[in-house]
């Protein structure tokens, strides 16, 4: 039996994709901005479509209901207030670095309404970046923000490791060339 060639795959899952899009659209860092994507026109029982990583760090799940976010933020703020100078807040912030630097700030967050059309459009642009390097038959799309790519046949062509190829594609996403 012939020896099978070793396969190399790249899995890309865009971190908190909807929340990240909303942060970037606002000129905010997706990793340090407290933001949820949810429809405020519904009740607080509405499920958040996304929660930013910094807000998840406070124990809020990625698919929390809005009332759970409200309740958890109240709990966090009660604890922060106990530890604040004179047990008083001097303001609020949705930015994690500010909250870490100033215990007298209350935890706040942005509620962004969902924009599915925008998320699909950006997902298409991201997919086009992948297509600059990988043929569509080697890209398996799992969801709007997840792909698995078989890059075995491309490593020799590009003279890269799988990690280098992944980083090349990811870096291209951060440049203005991504949508070209």
Residue map of PLM features:
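Gly/Gly-Pro- and Ser/Thr-rich, intrinsically disordered tail segments characteristic of DNA damage-repair
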Residues: 1-176
């Amino acid at each position: 039996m012939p020896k099978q060639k070793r396969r190399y795959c790249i899995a890309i899952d865009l971190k908190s994709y909807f929340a990240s899009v909303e942060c970037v659209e606002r000129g905010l860092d997706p990793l340090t901005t407290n933001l949820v994507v949810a429809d405020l026109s519904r009740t607080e029982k509405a499920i958040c479509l996304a929660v930013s990583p910094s807000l998840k760090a406070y124990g809020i799940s990625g698919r929390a209901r809005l009332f759970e976010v409200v309740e958890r933020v109240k709990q966090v703020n009660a604890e922060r207030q106990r530890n604040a100078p004179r047990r008083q807040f001097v303001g609020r912030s949705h930015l994690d670095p500010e909250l870490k630097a100033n215990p007298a700030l209350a935890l706040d967050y942005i509620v962004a309404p969902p924009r599915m059309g925008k998320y699909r459009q950006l997902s298409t642009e991201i997919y086009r970046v992948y297509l600059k390097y990988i043929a569509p038959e080697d890209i398996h799309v799992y969801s709007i923000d997840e792909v698995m790519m078989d890059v075995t046949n491309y490593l020799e062509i590009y003279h890269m490791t799988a990690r280098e190829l992944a980083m090349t594609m990811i870096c291209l996403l951060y440049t203005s060339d991504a949508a070209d």
